Curated annotation (Swiss-Prot):
Pfam family, one: ATP-synt_B
Membrane topology: Single-pass membrane protein
Location of the protein in the cell: Cell inner membrane
Similarity remark: Belongs to the ATPase B chain family.
Cellular component per GO, a single term: proton-transporting ATP synthase complex
Organism: Brucella melitensis biotype 1 (strain ATCC 23456 / CCUG 17765 / NCTC 10094 / 16M)
GO molecular function annotation: proton-transporting ATP synthase activity, rotational mechanism; proton-transporting ATPase activity, rotational mechanism
Main localization (coarse): membrane
Assembly information from the UniProt record: F-type ATPases have 2 components, F(1) - the catalytic core - and F(0) - the membrane proton channel. F(1) has five subunits: alpha(3), beta(3), gamma(1), delta(1), epsilon(1). F(0) has three main subunits: a(1), b(2) and c(10-14). The alpha and beta chains form an alternating ring which encloses part of the gamma chain. F(1) is attached to F(0) by a central stalk formed by the gamma and epsilon chains, while a peripheral stalk is formed by the delta and b chains.
Function: F(1)F(0) ATP synthase produces ATP from ADP in the presence of a proton or sodium gradient. F-type ATPases consist of two structural domains, F(1) containing the extramembraneous catalytic core and F(0) containing the membrane proton channel, linked together by a central stalk and a peripheral stalk. During catalysis, ATP synthesis in the catalytic domain of F(1) is coupled via a rotary mechanism of the central stalk subunits to proton translocation.
Protein name per its UniProtKB record: ATP synthase subunit b
Keyword vocabulary terms for this entry: ATP synthesis, Cell inner membrane, Cell membrane, CF(0), Hydrogen ion transport, Ion transport, Membrane, Transmembrane, Transmembrane helix, Transport
Signal peptide location: none
Region (Disordered): 1-26
Amino acid sequence: MFVSTAFAQTATESQPASTAGEHGAADAVHTETGVAHDAGHGSGVFPPFDSTHYASQVLWLAITFGLFYLFLSRVVLPRIGGVIETRRDRIAQDLEQAARLKQDADNAIAAYEQELAQARSKAASIAEAAREKGKGEADAERASAEAVLESKLKEAEERIAAIKAKAMSDVGNIAEETMATIVEQLLGLTADKASVSEAVKAIRASNA
């Protein structure tokens, strides 16, 4: 088949036009994609630092602090207040009991001193009588008086030691109960009695 010169020239002239049209369409697509791409990026500001979000951020911050304050005032603070009030009552009871035990100890000491004074007076009178009755009888009576004095002294010391031991035992038990109550109220856990006892003993040993 032969192609005429006019047809070949027409085909050659129309080819650049179609090529230019294709390039124009591609550029248009690229331009539209670029616009969409740039629009997708937006302003590029980190949302927490964007001034348009300040109002909502302040609102949520106020709501969060309000809920936190409500939780503290309705749950945490009443529990702590109850524990402190219970501890205050226990301390008052401990002080009253300690005062009573101290009064008992003072009474026991006063009775011991009175008995000691009487025993010394009796020993002095026995010594005076020994000059008349003889040294042998005086020594025997003195030994008897000293034995009685020693027995009464030992009895008084045992009474005082028992009172002090009871006081320390009561204070230790109260401290263990109070610590267990505080742990249960604040942490919601049941404290092991042995662990609480060891902790109280360690504190008392460090303060001794």
